[in-house]
Amino acid sequence: MSNEVKTINEFVEKYNEFKNEIGKVIVGQDIAIEQVLISIFCNGHCLLVGVPGLAKTLLVKTIADSLGLNFNRIQFTPDLMPSDIVGAEILNANREFKFIKGPLFSNIVLADEINRTPPKTQSALLEAMQERSVTNAGKKYYLDKPFFVLATQNPIEQEGTYPLPEAQLDRFMFNVVLDYPSYEEELE
């Protein structure tokens, strides 16, 4: 058996192990689990669309734990500023500026309710997604590798939101629509 075939078989085996491990915690969202894992392995990002209570945060946390990756959750709100997610320079005791990294400096970032924050902050996140780096005070800072964003949106509440334009939606590999689990899955 060639090395390529062996590598592919090992990958498939590991992928199935991850999927089964995550499925022990997240029930009834098999397609979402598949798409999120594929997106991570392909160095992409995901947008999850679903009402509250469908275990979106638990899904991301479980995936991060099973892959052994760092995880940060950012709750997007109307008053969130780009520096709140990117980080900022502060003056230290030696009167020198020091960059303090924001929550974007993690392997997996949950951008919860991305459409609740103004376009300026959305743009800072989308720049990080595209460039895998952020800019602060004219300096470029590279993000941790791997870097994966899972953003969520609530499809019901549209009042007080800032919809993502088509060009920004294009940054996501998958737009995953989550639905309620079946009665049998709920019992499980």
Locate predicted features.
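Pre-Walker A (pre-P-loop) alpha-helix and adjacent loop at the N terminus of AAA/AAA+ ATPase modules
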Residues: 8-54
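Conserved alpha-helical scaffold flanking the Walker A/P-loop in AAA+ ATPase domains
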Residues: 35-38, 91-110
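Walker A/P-loop
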Residues: 37-77
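P-loop (Walker A) phosphate-binding loop of NTP-binding proteins
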Residues: 51, 85, 152
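Conserved AAA+ ATPase "SRH/arginine-finger" region at the nucleotide-binding site
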Residues: 75-80, 173-184
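Conserved NTP-binding/hydrolysis module of P-loop NTPases
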Residues: 81-95
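Conserved AAA+/SF3 P-loop NTPase catalytic/coupling segment centered on the Walker-B
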Residues: 83, 106-130, 144, 159-168, ...
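AAA+/SF3 P-loop NTPase mechanochemical coupling elements
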Residues: 98-107, 136-153, 164-173
